Amino acid sequence: MNGSEQAQSAEAAGMTSSADRMVGMDHAEVRYFTSYDHHGIHEEMLKDDVRTRSYRDSIYQNRHIFKDKVVLDVGCGTGILSMFAAKAGAKHVIGVDMSSIIEKAKQIVACNGLSDRITLLQGKMEEVVLPYPKVDIIISEWMGYFLLYESMLDTVLYARDRYLVPGGKIFPDKATMYLAAIEDGEYKDDKIGFWDNVYGFDYSPMKEIALTEPLVDTVELKALVTDPCPIITLDLYTVTPADLAFKVPFTLAAKRSDFIHAVIAWFDIEFGACHKPITFSTGPHAKYTHWKQTVFYLRDVLTVEEEEVVSGVLENKPNDKNKRDLDINISYKFETTDNLRYSEGSCSYRMC
């Protein structure tokens, strides 16, 4: 059986409704997968010029890497990365996605005359049967808010360990997370302080909920009080699922005298397998992406002077009940000769 016949056989074997596939699946998993059934989320991602162009350029500018190779697209969505790979000369591309949007992806692939070179399979990566025993390249857009929220990185790692040939390539292959502290008094008062007086009533119990929910929003560069601090780099060739729960130190040096109301996080992505490496950032210094930045408001307001340092530890782990949610703890200490400004604390957050 040749590659095309294998692909047709794999597609035929996978013709089961989305509802049937999700029977017995955990409710949180069903909610996650069905959220990608709607066109709006795909429109937002495709319109993210930084995201989509970075993937396109990393593939098109490295046609010599993709030529005559078998490529696996993990979480293929509407198939844009699969089509980039096919256009770059891949021998065959296999796209896998659990969402029912894959039916539209098949139509899109057909509209673009690529059905003979792209096989799209609906199902979980751990359960589908690929038409090839091994692949030369894995491509995936797996990143979530705060890099790992609702992330499918563990699925990419499964695909790497199960299907990638020795010496195979992963696009992208590196992710680095950064922290910085910001002045954001006005917004914090609106989001947190609001609960102190709601039409004359004390709603302060709601502040606890508000403080534990990170905010995903665009932060202006001028709000940064400290220099960025890289806290962790994930190398997709070597990282393991266990590494996705981590506890890392950070040091934030003030670049001006100001107040600190929150800590923000963002990530940079690198396509290091390229002849000329391609990178993009989701930070406040870079062009807008749909990932924005993640804001963690602190209970205390810190008053820092230029060159003073806030040190601490960030701990991240998947939630025990829903592995796609994150439990995050940030502990910090601000030591200064001025005892009135000394501050130390710990805040716990839940991304859900």
Residues covered by each model-derived region:
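Class I SAM-binding transferase module
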Residues: 1-74, 78-352
